[in-house]
Each structure stands twice: as C-alpha cells, then as structure tokens.
Amino acid sequence: MKRSTVVIRPSARALSRQASSQSFLLARSSALTSRQRRLYSTHPPNARLNLPIDYATTPLLAHTSQAALSNPELPASVRNGTTKRMNLFQAINDALSTALAEDESVLIFGEDVAFGGVFRCTTKLAETYGGDRVFNTPLTEQGIMGFAIGAAAEGMRPVAEIQFADYVFPAFDQLVNEAAKFRYRDGAGGRSAGGLTVRMPCGGVGHGALYHSQSPEALFTHIPGLKVIIPRGPVQAKGLLLAAIRSNDPCVVMEPKILYRAAVEQVPTTAYELPLGKAEILKEGKDVTVVSYGQPLYKCMAALKAAEQDFGVSVELIDLRTIYPWDKETVFNSVRKTGRCVVVHEAMVNAGVGAEVAAAIQEDPETFVRLEAPVARIAGWSIPTPLVFEQFNLPDVTSKCYLTLGLADVYADGMPRDIRRHQKGDEFLRDLSMNSGILKQSMLHSSRRGVDWLMGIVLDDIILSVFLV
C-alpha cells in the first residue's frame, strides 16, 4: 500500500503576518543606531583578553627533571629519583594507582569510573586492581557520597569521584551533616569519616556553560571538618591527592578541568606527599602580594610579567593550594612586607575565598597596620556562566588592568582601541583621572548589555595601589 504524503501549507493570513513581521524587524533594525544594534549582536565586542598562556614555557610548571626534583618540599629519597612527563589527569591517575597499590583499604568509585572517567583520570585502574576496588556507581551523587561516608566509617579509605563539581549539590547534605560532623557527633572514641576523599573537576573550559563550568569551592570552605584542596599542576596534583587520601580528615580535591591536558610537567615517579594547609610562594616581590590558586595563577603570572616589564612593579605571587584551612602565616608575612594585597579567583566575587582572605588580613593587627591600600578582591561576576560569552565571564587580566591604568585609547562606548605604553608622572595621573569616569560608565553600560567583557580577575588595583599610594 502506497503511503500518502500530506503537505501543510501556510494560509494567506499566516504569510501576511510573516511578511509584516519581517518588514517591521527590517524597519526597526534600520532605525537603530550602530550602538543600539550591538544589543542584538551574537558576537561579543572586541576585547584584549588575557595575555596568551604558553603552558610549555610557564615558570609555574617543572619542564625539566632537575626543576621537578629540586622542590624542597620533596623528601630526599624522591629528589634523588627519576621523573616522567605527565599532564594533570595522568598525574592524578598515577596518584590513585599508587594509593591502590600501597593500601588495600583504598576504594575508588563514581559514575563511569571503571571505564576511566570522563577525563580519563581512572584509566585502567579497574583492570589492574579489580572491579571490587574500582567500580561504577548509579547516577546518584547523594548515593555516591552516602556510600563513601559509610565505607570511611568502617575503616576504609574511599575516593569518591563526582563527575563535575556542578553535580555535587544533591550530595551536599551528606557532606555537611554526615562527613564533616561524624567525628564531632561520635566523639574521640567513636567512628569518623576521616578516610574520605572526594574528587571533582571544576572551573571553566570555554564551552561548559551553566552546568559544567562552575567554581563552587567557597561553599565547601563554610563546612568545618573538611579540607579543600585545588592543585595548579601535575606535581601538585599527585602530591596533594596522596596527602588527602592518607589524611585522617575528610578532604575535597577540586581539579581545574581545563588543566587536565594543558598543564604538562615532569613528575617524580616515586610516591610523595605535599603538605596540606601550606601555601607556596611562586614568585617573590616587594610592591604587592597577589594571592590565588588553580588555573588563574597562570593568567596572573602572564599579566605580572607584563606589569613588571612596563611599569617596574615588583609582585609577589602566592599559591594557596589548600583554600580551607588556608595558610594565614605565609600570606600575612608577605602582606606585611609589601603593604598591598590582591586576591584572585575564578569563582564569583561575593562571599568567595577573596572575601575571607581580605577579612582575615584586616583583622590581624600586625598585618593591618602595614597596609598601604585596601585589600582588593578580583573575581568573577555573580551570574550563571553563559555559553556563548563564557570566555568573557572568565578572568580577563590584561584588558582591565591596562584600561583602569589609562593605558588604552577608548571608543565612545568604552571599548578598547589599542594598548600602548603610557608616560608616568603628572601626565599619567591626569589621564588616569580623566579615564576613570569613562571606564566606570563603560563597566555599567557593559553590565546592562550583558556583554561582560570587563570581567573578573584584573590587576588594576595592583598598579593603582603602587602608583597612587
């Protein structure tokens, strides 16, 4: 039997409406000014985003065996050993394999973990150590966390993987009211979830949008009883993850997913730990302290090099590594020396890690009296991560740094024309004063349009405090 085809044609009335609508939109578009038409654009305005990061040459990674083994935090037995070139996910895989080999109480599980995981961090672990120690779970974060807490309470050392940090929220009740409080509830002689480690990828990648690019680390820093760790590279990832697994406190290890393949360095092949709760001074300076963690450190380093070259500003860069509990002593000592501090992170600015660091600095009398300028928080907008404009929702170090300094010619609507060297002295201050009003209006205008190109981590406060205070 032959099948008949029914063709539905639009009525004359519908066609008339469509033509009228198109005519109206065309007339409306032609009546708009070029500035108004930008509201309808699907493309963000031209902006000088962050200076390009060359992961192959950045000083934040150990590109040679000598550099990797010269780390003073490594034990002597490791410093006399060998290294292997690894990216971040390979270093995590190596740490997990080491933990499984050394301790039979270690279990690893999560969604697609037996398969190797979305980012391949658990590749071949199930084949090597067996499906009873490395296995998949149903798609239930609350169930994953509950199982992990129960296993830890029975003396195991479970490593639970949450596929994306964005997915952890159904498990939040388990983390807050069970994992973190177990020890307080049962007392010193009771059981605890101290052997628990939770891994999760976090941060933006350029196309993750609302449910795959969030940075919720500050939420975990409000939970007494947890340790929260964010590595910046493979050497750190291996050492900090092993320390977390061996720790007797429940730990949350948040891994910047954009670094899984981008960050590559020489990693010691033997087992080692890096200290939890201890920051690392990546670069010493005398004019201002920049405190950050994870992927934004690379953007900071690129911008700081440019700032030092153009203006002679000496910047001290600190990697927190553990954001809760964080290393107050290292940060305070640095700020007492420089008199200025900027805290940088990708997560939204409100109630973030930057707020805690800034408050702690001004609450410490010995540090506060040495401040030459207010502590600056430089972070993300308090908005969901957009898909099309995600790169503009991530930290833009260079653009806003140069703009706020008055180093860029500006269009009438506040967009940068070009970047140039700027004279110092009275002319510099005069131009800076004139441009500041334009830039403030530009920022408000950009925010209203939803084109958030003046985003996030910026080093304007660094240079302003150095030149103007």
Swiss-Prot record:
Predominant subcellular localization, coarse grouping: mitochondrion
CDD domains: TPP_PYR_E1-PDHc-beta_like (cd07036)
Residues engaged in binding thiamine diphosphate: 167
GO cellular component entries: mitochondrial matrix
Cofactor(s), by name: thiamine diphosphate
Pfam family membership, one: Transketolase_C
Leader sequence residues: none
GO biological process: branched-chain amino acid catabolic process; response to nutrient
This protein's name: 2-oxoisovalerate dehydrogenase subunit beta, mitochondrial
